[in-house]
Amino acid sequence: MGRRAHISDADLTAAAGRVCARLGPGRATIDTIAREAGVPVGSVYHRTDSRTALLAEVWIAAAQVFGNEFLMKLQDARSLDTAAEVALVTPRFTRTDHAGGVVLLAHRRDDFLEGAPDEARARAARLSSDLQKGLTDAARRLLPDDKRGREKMAVALIGIPYGAVRVFLPQATPPAELDPVILAATMAALTH
């Protein structure tokens, strides 16, 4: 009978995400991740093929949580008003998962995926592709006569909230008082 696992894959990825948010992915070593997780270094190596593979999982995990919420709200949007609400997924995500927000919004994707296994890179590419497809579909549905509808959706739902929260990250969490400002700017971008 094998020994009981010291840590789950999800808990290890979360610990690695916290280290990456605090120190940056370049300084996230297996030793610092093991300390954050409260497990021996050997337990980390037992759970992952390599540091590179673990960092890829950190980005993918954050992108999945964010992307699932973003796409669910975007697919449910039936008006520009409800589409504008999708922009609030970004600041709310950074408030509920500060480490995930820092991973996605304060670092480059390639900082986590460079040298990653092909399978992880393919999963990350699918997540990005799904987000782009969601924006395209929303533009066709909500701005059907606007030749620049796709651009407007991208600026309004990605660019504006990203710029607003990036002012605070990684050191601080964007305050809730920022949400009405993001919403107003998003509506302006969608309607002009």
Where are these regions (language model features)?
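N-terminal intrinsically disordered/low-complexity leader segments
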Residues: 1-7, 18
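Helix-turn-helix
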Residues: 11, 15, 19-53, 57
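Short hydrophobic clusters on alpha-helical segments that form packing/core surfaces
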Residues: 12-20, 62, 66, 90, ...
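Hydrophobic alpha-helical connector segments
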Residues: 57, 71-99, 154
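Hydrophobic/aromatic residues within well-ordered alpha-helical segments
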Residues: 58, 62, 66, 90, ...
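Amphipathic alpha-helical packing segments from all-alpha helical-bundle domains
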Residues: 67-68, 103, 113-144, 151-155
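Secondary-structure edge/capping motif, primarily at the C-terminal ends of alpha-helices
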Residues: 70-77, 104-112, 142, 164, ...
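Hydrophobic alpha-helical segments that form the core
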Residues: 91-92, 132-137, 145-170, 175-189
